Amino acid sequence: MPTSESAVSDPLASVSAVIPSAGLHQRLVMAALEQMDSGHLRLQLPDGTVRHLGTQGHASSATLTILRPAFFTRVLLHGDVGFGEAYVEGDCDTDDIEKLIAWAILNLDKSPAFSGSRTKKLGLNLLQVTNRIQHLLRPNSRSTARRNIAEHYDLGNEFYQLWLDPTMTYSSARWKSPGQTLEEAQIEKYDALCQQLKLTAADHVLEIGSGWGGFASHAVHTYGCRVTSVTISQKQHDYAAARFQREGIADRIDLRLQDYRDITGTFDKVVSIEMMEALGDKYLETYFAKIHEVVAPNGLVALQYITCPDSRHGQMKRGIDWIQKHIFPGSLLLSIGRVSHAAQRTGDLFLHKLDDLGLDYARTLREWHTTFNARLPAVRGLGFDDRFIRRWNYYLLYCAAAFAMRNISVVQATYTRPNNPLLR
């Protein structure tokens, strides 16, 4: 639970003797940082010395205060994973995490310390292979997938209730107008997917990945359809089951604690919201083969998933970043091209409609971050310590920066078979 991660020994301790000279660590990392001259970084070293990298006064400016020499060792050995670990452990600090990550993204191809960088100069990220092996040992097989999901989503329903909106939705919202609340924007997102599916009361919808029941609740209340929803998270299953009973719609929803690979039957429509990232590249064809198997001949499929550029998918597949190690084990972002390839290899589904919501996700994450920090006394009351809080803040704003910079995005995509009369 919350205290278990805090009790884990610092990974730096086991490798601190790999390169004995702290001064050497600093010189190597500083040589890499000095290549990152886009934007502006105000950098304060442990001895109080202030350095300015890039152009002062630049619109993309950030600050980084390095508090302990351990920062340099972490970055030298583990690149951007070590950078995030240094923040969580208090080896460095900043007045704005999002601005700092945005600066790093702006310089992505100028430093070998960051995942996805094409730069091979200097010997940073020396122990990347250890993180990579750790990641490879957690493929999303039936048994491992449950463990990977539980590690993030089973932190406790009470924890997520503190900072999610009343719909209990943990995926990007979709803003129709600037004045909408997060709750309204989440409902807007659900309804956009329902509209893409051309949902009617006669439909039987399969939802792969239940979350806490937000989509199923909206679809049944608004359109009167039936929903079969599957999840492998025990905590989410229990919350959703109680929710459907409370809302008086349990008779319209077949909620299952079931792996998507075990789904049988035929469904008029299929929806899945930000579940595909948890598949890993290895199981993407398996996922689409199952969808192709269960969707009716004239059915529609609506997917919301986080994307990376096609040009970087191979690099992301071969590497591992801080999010994959510390937040979503076993995960991998997908490119639109890779998803289309998987759909084509396993059947005749093809892309009919695509909407990009990248900036909507940046706003969603900022709203979560604001609410999370407003509820810190309650977060601590659940047993989460300051280290966990730093980790969660880094996670939320790391992602917000990535979406705001268009480094990654999120899409709503509708798939169909050829000659579908619903689309005429």
List the model feature ranges, each with a label.
Residues 201-211:
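Conserved class I S-adenosyl-L-methionine
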Residues 212-223:
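Conserved SAM-binding loop of SAM-dependent methyltransferases across substrates and taxa
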Residues 240-241:
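Conserved SAM-binding loop
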Residues 261-270:
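A short acidic, Gly/Pro-enriched loop at the edge of an enzyme's catalytic core
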Residues 298-306:
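Conserved beta-strand signature within the Rossmann-like core of class I S-adenosyl-L-methionine
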Residues 307-423:
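Substrate-binding/catalytic lobe of Class I Rossmann-like enzymes that use SAM or dcSAM, i.e.
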